[in-house]
Amino acid sequence: MSLITSSGAFAQKIVVAHRGASGYLPEHTLEAKAMAYAMGADYIEQDVVMTKDDQLIVIHDITLDRTTDVGEQFPGRARADGKHYVIDFTLAEIRQLAASEGARIVNGQRVQGYAARFPMRTSSFRISTLAEELELIQGMNKSTGRDIGIYPEIKSPEFHLAEGKDLGRAVVAELKAYGYASKEQKVFLQTFSWEEVKRLRDEILPEAGIDLKLVMLVGDDEEYQWMFNESGMQEVGRYADGFGPDKSLLIAPDSTPGNLKISNLVELAHSNGMQVHPYTFRADAGQVAKWAGSFEEMLEAFFFEAGIDGAFTDFPDRAVEFLRQR
């Protein structure tokens, strides 16, 4: 499907597989990406972090602890805060780690983040490089005749720069090497850093000789509040083609079935030429909005009452089917 980004008129609504089909398989594994592809997602997300030897890997956190067995494989390698940072390990070392469904620490024990998902520490999964994932998606595009897009995120660019690594420039170089060069292609490049969005638009992309659609990710944090009005959104729209808010910024969590408290952020973004792709839609117990009777009712409200253009979801099959039925 074509995407129109130069005006307020946008193409068909899209489904973005958040960390792949992460509701069914461990996040950011190639298996989760292949499943998302087969489920019909329009775009597949890649969170990108850099290793000690400047390799680009696909992982959500800048640390390895939540989704791997790094503490067991490499004792004594944590920083003072007790965490194992990707940037302190080479790709060869990271290849030795087992990837797994995410965990949190409760009373010193690892507890699976979402209890009903793929069992933690079972089967065999690995962390992949950005290149490997791009080759997987492009390979399936060739073998199926489809054109499924990519949605990479530059993770914590300021952290990387402070460590002497220009992650944004490296990601753009990798995308260019794999043929992503224009806004007409199915690629969105996202980040939570306003400074990085400006640097990408003003410096990195022009120097690389390519032009990609950029998405400004935002949370409900003080640093983003200036964007949530006409003048702020106009400034964001000078640099970004898309606006990626936490979904709670669009429909207030304390809404009720008969009274949805819908903000004006979608309207503001659209009037400034940006698509709106909020995150994250989950069907797990406790993750469906209290004002919605089901996952699908939640999607209905966001897509057709709030007016979003696309959604990040851990359950791409259900979102795809919802839009097909709609």
What are these regions (language model features)?
Residues 1-5:
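Bacterial N-terminal signal peptides
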Residues 7-326:
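Phosphate-group recognition and catalysis centered on beta-loop-alpha active-site segments
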